């Protein structure tokens, strides 16, 4: 605990924190070729590689992910949620923040049902997360 005199001399410093999705907080001014700080909920990008990865220790699967080059020039790994996908190299996708706990280095999710990404077929529950339309009665 600091003394009163120490607090009078220097105030308490607010704790600094690091963002968990840095690619969403970076923009590029292509005319001036400068990096700018923008806060975006999503970013668009082009898939450079679509592959599978095995998860960390207690889990076992082949999780699908894509390496995406974003409009701000960064390359990130993004998880492809849901069963089955139509993504391949040069597909245009929209990513959002949100890590996958058992995949190291994957801090983003691809949004299903937008741009070149198709929605998950035959999805009845949690449809909005997978871009699925409401089924006809």
From Swiss-Prot:
Protein name: Small ribosomal subunit protein uS12
Function description: With S4 and S5 plays an important role in translational accuracy. Interacts with and stabilizes bases of the 16S rRNA that are involved in tRNA selection in the A site and with the mRNA backbone. Located at the interface of the 30S and 50S subunits, it traverses the body of the 30S subunit contacting proteins on the other side and probably holding the rRNA structure together. The combined cluster of proteins S8, S12 and S17 appears to hold together the shoulder and platform of the 30S subunit.
Gene Ontology molecular function, alphabetical: rRNA binding; structural constituent of ribosome; tRNA binding
Organism: Mesoplasma florum (strain ATCC 33453 / NBRC 100688 / NCTC 11704 / L1)
Recorded GO CC terms: small ribosomal subunit
UniProt keywords, alphabetically: Methylation, Ribonucleoprotein, Ribosomal protein, RNA-binding, rRNA-binding, tRNA-binding
CDD domains xref list: Ribosomal_S12
Gene: rpsL
Homology family: Belongs to the universal ribosomal protein uS12 family.
InterPro entries xrefs: NA-bd_OB-fold (IPR012340), Ribosomal_uS12 (IPR006032), Ribosomal_uS12_bac (IPR005679)
Subunit structure: Part of the 30S ribosomal subunit. Contacts proteins S8 and S17. May interact with IF1 in the 30S initiation complex.
One biological process term in Gene Ontology: translation
Pfam (any one): Ribosom_S12_S23
């Amino acid at each position: 605990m600091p003394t009163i005199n120490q607090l009078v001399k220097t105030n308490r410093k607010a704790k600094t924190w690091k963002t968990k999705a840095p690619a969403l907080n970076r923009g590029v001014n292509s005319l001036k070729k400068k990096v700018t700080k923008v806060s975006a909920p999503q970013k668009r990008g082009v898939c450079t590689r679509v592959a599978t990865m095995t998860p960390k220790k207690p889990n076992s699967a082949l999780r699908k992910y894509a390496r995406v080059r974003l409009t701000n020039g960064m390359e990130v790994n993004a998880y492809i949620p849901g069963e089955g996908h139509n993504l391949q190299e040069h597909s245009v996708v929209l990513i959002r923040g949100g890590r996958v706990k058992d995949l190291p280095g994957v801090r983003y999710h691809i949004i299903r049902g937008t741009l070149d990404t198709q929605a998950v077929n035959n999805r009845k529950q949690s449809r909005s997360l997978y871009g699925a339309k409401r089924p006809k009665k």
